[in-house]
Amino acid sequence: MFSASIERAQNEAPFPIRQGVFVAVAGPSGGGKDSVMAYARERLGNLAGEIVFARRIITRPFAPGGEEHDTRDVPTFEREEAAGAFALSWRANGLCYALPAALDEEMRSGGVVVANVSRAIIPALGERYAHIFPVIVTAPRGVLAERLSRRGRETRDEVLSRLARSEAGELDVPGALVIDNSGPLEQAGERFLEALRKAAAWSDVCDMV
């Protein structure tokens, strides 16, 4: 009776949401997270209806060929943040980032949500969602430096700062699946696609508990 009461109280609490699986994709700038995610997204097959790729809100203008995201200026971002419009928000590299609060309903429906996030917010994700599957997409320093220089979005000092963060062990996440994306995209993409299949299977089990 006592354990049943605890379980009922847990299920009635708003957070952490105990349905669904959140696939938290992190890694150093230049690691190719967006490319790996796009590769898998195009090949979901019959899992397409179960997996949602979150669209981030960022205080950065949209650039052709870059990540598709919703843009806000800083004052608007901060107003929406204060109003509870975001499931989670964070600051990094001089920008503000957020995930929309609508993802809570996707999780409660028992689906799989995939999002590009900062490693630093993964503990906070665990407070909001009970089932987190962290994935780190990375590459050696030389590959990161080449990619960052090629995309031309950061200054030299910003590139060096991002490389220093990856070397400082900032991307170490206990229990994470680490994907090396220094070779052909297909190799990393297939590993990530397999991770999504496992996340979908895990979500099915979560829904039965």
UniProtKB/Swiss-Prot annotation:
It catalyses: alpha-D-ribose 1,5-bisphosphate + ATP = 5-phospho-alpha-D-ribose 1-diphosphate + ADP. It is an enzyme of class 2 (transferase). GO terms for biological process: 5-phosphoribose 1-diphosphate biosynthetic process; organic phosphonate metabolic process. ATP binds at G27, P28, S29, G30, G31, G32, K33, D34. Its EC number is 2.7.4.23. Pathway: Metabolic intermediate biosynthesis; 5-phospho-alpha-D-ribose 1-diphosphate biosynthesis; 5-phospho-alpha-D-ribose 1-diphosphate from D-ribose 5-phosphate (route II): step 3/3. Keywords: ATP-binding, Nucleotide-binding, Transferase. The keyword Oxidoreductase does not apply. One of its GO terms (molecular function) is ATP binding. SUPFAM superfamilies: P-loop containing nucleoside triphosphate hydrolases (SSF52540). Catalyzes the phosphorylation of ribose 1,5-bisphosphate to 5-phospho-D-ribosyl alpha-1-diphosphate (PRPP). Belongs to the ribose 1,5-bisphosphokinase family. HAMAP family: PhnN. This is Ribose 1,5-bisphosphate phosphokinase PhnN. The lineage of its organism: Bacteria, Pseudomonadati, Pseudomonadota, Alphaproteobacteria, Hyphomicrobiales. The gene is phnN.
